[in-house]
A protein has these predicted regions:
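Surface-exposed loop and turn segments in beta-propeller and other repeat-based domains
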Residues: 1, 41-62, 97-123, 182-188, ...
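Coil residues (strongly favoring Ser/Thr
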Residues: 13-14, 29, 95, 114
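Beta-propeller blade signature
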Residues: 25-40, 84, 88, 156-177, ...
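Hydrophobic beta-strand positions that form the internal "hydrophobic ladder"
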Residues: 15, 76, 140-142, 201
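Short, conserved, GDST-rich strand-edge loop motifs in beta-rich repeat architectures
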Residues: 13, 17-27, 143-163, 206-220
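Structural signature of eukaryotic scaffold interfaces centered on beta-propeller domains
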Residues: 1-12, 59-73, 79, 124-137, ...
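Loop/turn-rich, solvent-exposed surfaces of beta-rich toroidal or solenoidal domains
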Residues: 123-174, 179
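Loop-centered beta-sheet repeat module
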Residues: 24-93
């Protein structure tokens, strides 16, 4: 399995990629290393973390696969949407460090019930999202969704596709210390579409509830880090 938030990484002759969770086995590895010369595969020693409800194997939604992974040139960093911690791994995953990266806007993740969840739950419950590495400023950006509300007339599945109603970005330094966490205005930006460039971080403002939204144009706003 490889998605835009879990891109394969090639280091010399080895390709590191992610694999789908298997709920029915005891040890459920997240990643696999593939030797590009011999085509041999090796599952890496890092399992999908447990979370409230993960013991239920037959379910409507599978939260295990909700995560992102980035590579900073030395380490892989995993951000599971249901976990306040991030996981920092060496390429071979023989060393895994768990680091608390908790939002200041909510105390704990509010997971939808795996069997009875409704689309609205995915719009209003608090949890985390993707993590990006910024090599130009040597910082990391972790998206967090605080508890929210669903406005009258808003279709929940459409809102989810555009990054929900609001969000914050937890900014981490190269040692994973929190530098700040700005909260962004309602219905303005789409945090699922972000670009890191030498001049700054670009976040799409093509949110369908933004008054300036144009279905024919994908637009961005540039943000720069400023020391306080």
């Amino acid at each position: 399995m490889a998605t835009a938030s879990q891109l394969p990484v090639r280091i010399e002759d080895t390709l590191y990629t992610c694999i789908e969770p298997d709920r029915l086995i005891e040890h459920d590895p997240v990643s696999v290393a593939i030797n590009m010369n011999t085509k041999e595969e090796k599952k890496l020693p890092f399992d999908y973390p447990d979370y409230p409800g993960s013991e239920v194997k037959l379910k409507r939604y599978g939260m295990e696969a909700s995560y992102s992974r980035c590579y900073d040139g030395q380490r892989f960093i995993y951000s599971f949407h249901y976990d306040e911690n991030i996981y920092v791994a060496t390429p071979e995953h023989d060393s895994i460090r768990k680091v608390s990266v908790k939002s200041k806007y909510f105390d704990k993740v509010q997971l939808p019930d795996e069997l009875t969840a409704s689309p609205e739950d995915f719009c209003v419950n608090a949890w985390y999202n993707n993590l990006l590495y910024d090599p130009y400023r040597e910082v990391y950006y972790r998206i967090a969704y605080p508890p929210s509300t669903l406005d009258k007339g808003v279709r929940p599945m459409e809102l989810v596709q555009f990054g929900r109603k609001n969000f914050s970005i937890i900014i981490l330094d190269k040692d994973f210390r929190i530098l700040g966490e700005p909260l962004f205005p309602d219905n303005t930006y789409n945090p699922t579409i972000m670009l890191v460039r030498p001049e700054g971080l670009y976040i799409s403002d093509s949110h369908y509830l933004n008054p300036r939204f144009n279905d024919d144009i994908l637009s961005f706003r540039k943000f720069e880090l400023v020391e306080e």
